[in-house]
């Protein structure tokens, strides 16, 4: 394959970059200035088409597609390309799935890595204290802890360096119950709510005439679920070119750079490196899509806003919306508007706690300690709650 190189402008930020891809090896080599954020992923959706999304110059926080350089690769296409704004499928893919990938990256993955990198013995604390992650192989845990805490392993000033980070991210979007409540006007409605279910690919049609006349600007929200989230951490060979970092292929057990990585690892810690990749599964969570509607307009809308909601299967934290959660198992059942309202109220209360947790990490990531995080700061959302919400309970033995 002919390699392509992308040279991107420098981004000034206090946070390290994260590189995500769902390919077994990168589709291209990237010359990236330090601090640039890249996100690439593989998604099941769009009539089972395979899609990859790449975004640079993304600011922290809410997703803003107009403030980023976005490229996509759909189906059998060989290279990334700019989004064609005249093609609905491409716009839909970039807006919806790109927004979801940003939320995954900045609201789950990056805080998780930040916490792990800065709290001493954090893997043992998370795994043993909360009975969340069980490591049958102690060497696996020790190697993962060292790699996370030293995510750029510098061997020399040349090209014999390795960066450790998130290699693969895969997830499915699934149909969930719709919340068609307009927060600005109660008269806005959709034409596709006969069974009160939605799909992430669904466009809504607003009719400005007749019995559903919406004579005011309005906001319509729809709830979708993100499931079957799989992540893989691995090493990628890097080299420096001035203030730029060059990414090459990911290291596998049989790649040409494996022996070099093991040499660098042993010289640094005097132990043998036996694992080159580390896989986890994450819990499902929900995303609230927001549609801004114009008064007296009949047209199709794509979602233009995203809100990350607390992971959907947090144990023992659901009160008023239990029937809603049961209904998610059986899509033939319907939920009432009251149940939808209670669900969103419950989720948003918990999301406020997560927001404060993530914000605290972001603002204090150089001085974070286990003692600085406690239940008092986050009401009933403790550190244990945070990680239980993110990870599936797993036993790891690779």
From Swiss-Prot:
The keyword Acyltransferase does not apply. One of its GO terms (cellular component) is plasma membrane. The keyword Cell division does not apply. It is a lipid-anchor. It is found in: Cell membrane. A lipid is attached at residue 23 (S-diacylglycerol cysteine). Residues 1-22 form the signal peptide. A lipid is attached at residue 23 (N-palmitoyl cysteine). Keywords: Cell membrane, Lipoprotein, Membrane, Palmitate, Signal. This is Uncharacterized lipoprotein MG095. It comes from Mycoplasma genitalium (strain ATCC 33530 / DSM 19775 / NCTC 10195 / G37).
């Amino acid at each position: 394959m002919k390699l392509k190189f992308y040279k991107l402008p420098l981004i000034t930020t206090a946070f390290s970059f994260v590189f995500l891809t769902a390919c077994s090896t990168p589709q291209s080599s990237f010359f990236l200035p330090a601090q640039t954020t890249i996100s690439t992923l593989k998604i099941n959706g769009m009539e089972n088409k395979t899609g990859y999304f790449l975004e640079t110059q993304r600011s922290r926080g809410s997703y803003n597609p107009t403030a980023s350089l976005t490229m996509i690769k759909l189906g059998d296409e060989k290279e990334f390309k700019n989004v064609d704004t005249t093609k609905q499928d491409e716009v839909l893919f970039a807006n919806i799935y790109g927004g979801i990938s940003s939320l995954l990256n900045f609201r789950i993955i990056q805080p998780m890595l930040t916490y792990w990198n800065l709290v001493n013995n954090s893997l043992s604390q998370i795994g043993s204290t909360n009975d969340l992650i069980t490591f049958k192989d102690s060497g696996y845990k020790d190697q993962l802890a060292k790699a996370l805490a030293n995510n750029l392993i510098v061997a020399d000033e040349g090209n014999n360096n390795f960066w450790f980070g998130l290699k693969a991210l895969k997830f499915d979007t699934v149909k969930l119950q719709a919340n068609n409540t307009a927060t600005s006007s109660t008269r806005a409605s959709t034409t596709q709510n006969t069974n009160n279910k939605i799909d992430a690919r669904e466009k809504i049609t607003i009719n400005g005439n007749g019995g559903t006349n919406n004579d005011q600007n309005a906001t319509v929200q729809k709830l979708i679920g993100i499931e079957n989230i799989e992540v893989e951490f691995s090493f990628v060979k890097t080299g420096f070119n001035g203030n730029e970092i060059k990414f090459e292929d990911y290291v596998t057990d049989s790649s040409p750079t494996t022996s070099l990585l093991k040499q660098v690892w042993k010289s640094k810690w005097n132990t043998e490196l036996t694992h080159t990749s580390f896989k986890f599964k994450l819990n499902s969570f929900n995303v609230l899509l927001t549609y801004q509607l114009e008064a007296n307009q009949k047209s199709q809308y794509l979602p233009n806003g995203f809100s990350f909601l607390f992971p959907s299967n947090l144990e023992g934290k659901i009160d008023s919306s239990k029937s809603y959660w049961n209904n998610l198992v059986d899509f033939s059942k319907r939920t009432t508007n009251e149940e939808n309202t209670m669900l969103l109220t419950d989720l948003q209360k918990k999301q406020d706690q997560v927001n404060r947790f993530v914000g605290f990490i972001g603002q204090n990531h150089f001085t974070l300690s286990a003692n600085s995080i406690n239940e008092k700061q986050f009401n009933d959302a403790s550190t244990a709650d945070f990680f239980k919400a993110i990870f599936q309970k797993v036993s790891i033995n690779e």
